[in-house]
Structures are given as structure tokens and as C-alpha cells.
Amino acid sequence: MRVVFHVPGRPVPKARPRVTKKGYAYTPRKTMAFEQSVVLAYRKSKAAGEPFPEGVPLMMELTFTFEPPKSWSKTRREEVIRRGMCPTCRPDLDNLMKGVADALNGVAYKDDGQIAGAVIRKQYGRKDNTRVIIETMDQKEG
């Protein structure tokens, strides 16, 4: 089984929970909005609507595309896209993946602990977006 979908807009890393003066923890709005857009994109792309079976190891491939900074010249912006250069600044890859994996908990799979392998990359592109591929891993008997 394999699912491929795109999430439009700038990728948002999973932020740490914030705590109010009274001690209540909450997830920041920006993180919640991104997680909701991931779920919406997943539901729009899914053909059968069935989540991956519980206990099945999954492989996740994530490509986070960022527009080059507006402060760069048009020539430089075009060059980094053409040459396939990758951003080396924030946000961190692990937090970007966490945002997508947590958003799909209970939607695409029972728990993100099922993710047994991942390929994650950041790149520059013309539009901000996130490409997600989730598939079952082949089990080889040893």
C-alpha cells in the first residue's frame, strides 16, 4: 500500500508545547494549523480512506520545499533552484518530520511508532510545500 500527497504552504516544524500561567499546556496555533493542513491534504489524496493496518512497519519519505529568501537577488534565487541546492538553516529536519508524523497519528496509521524508516530532505523550490509518501515496508524473513 502506498499514499502520496502534497501539503501546500510553508512547512512548519513541530513546536514545543507552551504552558499558561495556570499550568495548562497547549500546542501553538501555527503548529496546529499546519497539522490540520497535513490531515486535510491526506484525506483529499486517499483513495480508499482506510488507514494503514496496525502493527505494520511503514516507510515515510518527506520532501520539504522552501522558497529562497526574498532578500536574495532574482539571479541567486533562480540559481539555487536550478542547481538543486538545499537550505542549511532552520527549521531542523527532525522537527519538520515530527510535525507531519504527529499530524497523521490516528488518521493514516494508529501510531507514529509504526514508522520504521524515513527519508527526509529540505530543498529550495519555486513554491513552499511538503511532499509526503507513506508505504508499507517489505518484511523479509530471516
Regions found by a protein language model. Name each.
Residues M1-G142:
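Acidic, proline/glycine-enriched N-terminal capping motif
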